[in-house]
């Protein structure tokens, strides 16, 4: 978190002289890649199939910029046989809670979500985070990608880039 955000948290929680641990940005267990595929979905499908072959049952998060993208990607992955669920602000509280629990407790392997998903989520064994679209800013990207590999094991953070992303 930025210094301003840390100060806000301390003020809101009324913390007096807290111990604050600040670490660097480098997490050696995370592999970062930016890809510019001709067909994002085909690239994603290929990536997930390879992941399933090498590491069956791996958990992962796919971040999309819009609810519409979440719905499209989740539907297509389900049609292609993946254990997938979704999360965005357009779902009822009940469905969001159910889908979140399905992911956390490994009833579903893949969460397709907007940035509404993730705050307060601590699932240590997330093996990959894919950004299907460009995130809104670097801070969002770092926070979302940082949900991978919290158990210290190797994890991948993949960003799919397309020129159209600059306009969204």
Regions found by a protein language model. Give the residues of each.
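Helicase motor core with emphasis on the C-terminal RecA-like subdomain
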Residues: 1-168
């Amino acid at each position: 978190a930025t210094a301003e955000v840390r100060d806000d948290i301390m003020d809101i929680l009324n913390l007096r002289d807290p111990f604050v641990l600040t670490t660097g940005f480098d997490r050696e267990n995370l592999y970062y890649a930016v890809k510019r595929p001709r067909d994002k979905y085909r690239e994603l499908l290929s990536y997930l199939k390879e992941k399933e072959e090498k590491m069956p049952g791996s958990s992962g998060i796919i971040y999309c910029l819009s609810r519409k993208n979440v719905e499209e990607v989740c539907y297509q992955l389900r049609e292609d046989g993946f254990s997938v669920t979704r999360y965005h602000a357009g779902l009822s509280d009940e469905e969001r809670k159910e889908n979140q629990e399905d992911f956390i407790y490994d009833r579903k392997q893949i969460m397709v979500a907007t940035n509404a998903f993730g705050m307060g989520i601590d699932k240590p064994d997330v093996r990959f985070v894919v950004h299907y679209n460009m995130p809104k800013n670097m801070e969002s990207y770092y926070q979302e990608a940082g949900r991978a590999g919290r158990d210290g094991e190797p994890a991948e953070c993949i960003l799919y880039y397309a020129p159209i992303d600059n306009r969204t």
